[in-house]
């Protein structure tokens, strides 16, 4: 049945990847592009939005890491290009504001690239290493929702601290 709709496993991968990237991109851009909101509020909303996206798609980070590490260069480029475009949009929008806030002494010196890497690293880690973490910190499934909420808010706190002077 899948073969009928998609033709190849590669086409199925590409369709799923693009759909998920669009969802994540929309959520991130919606948060980061709200120019009427203060910078920190947009960063916090973007961080929470990204975390919520990952919580709704917990297998996606591991899947992408596996696919990228096992992929040929053509697949790598097809995965990398839309992600690169999304990051360039976010960086292009935020970097001038970050530079201005750093110049005014309102936030600690940082580039958008470093800020995004910090945010993504904090959010993605649990979803990549959850099977190693859960036995020590998450006793049963009902605790998982509370644990994820705590992790999300801790990630926000860490980024807030990182930007504080």
PLM regions and their residue ranges:
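Helix-turn-helix
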Residues: 1-11, 15
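Alpha-helical structural elements of signaling/regulatory helical domains
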Residues: 8, 34-38, 56-60, 74, ...
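A ubiquitous short alpha-helical element
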Residues: 11-13, 33, 48-51, 78-85, ...
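Hydrophobic alpha-helical connector segments
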Residues: 15, 30-62, 90-91, 112-119, ...
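Short, basic, alpha-helical segments at the C-terminal edge of helix-turn-helix-like DNA-binding modules
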Residues: 18-23
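Amphipathic alpha-helical packing segments from all-alpha helical-bundle domains
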Residues: 25-29, 41, 73-103, 114, ...
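C-terminal peripheral helix-coil segments that are non-catalytic and often amphipathic
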Residues: 49-52, 56, 88-108, 122-165
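Amphipathic alpha-helical segments used for helix-helix packing
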Residues: 56-78, 130-138
């Amino acid at each position: 049945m899948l073969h009928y709709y998609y033709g190849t496993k590669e086409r199925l991968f590409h369709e799923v990847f693009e759909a998920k990237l669009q969802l994540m991109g929309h959520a991130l851009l919606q948060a980061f592009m709200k120019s009427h909101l203060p910078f920190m509020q947009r960063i916090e909303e973007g961080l929470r939005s990204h975390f919520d996206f990952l919580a709704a798609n917990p297998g996606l980070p591991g899947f992408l890491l596996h696919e990228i590490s096992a992929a040929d260069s053509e697949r790598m480029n097809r995965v990398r290009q839309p992600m690169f475009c999304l990051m360039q949009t976010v960086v292009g929008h935020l970097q001038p504001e970050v530079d201005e806030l750093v110049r005014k002494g309102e936030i600690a010196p940082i580039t958008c690239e470093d800020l995004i890497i910090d945010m993504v690293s904090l959010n993605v880690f649990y979803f990549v290493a959850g099977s190693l973490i859960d036995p020590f910190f998450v006793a049963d499934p009902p605790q998982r929702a509370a644990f994820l909420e705590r992790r999300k808010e801790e990630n926000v706190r860490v980024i807030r601290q990182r930007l504080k002077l």
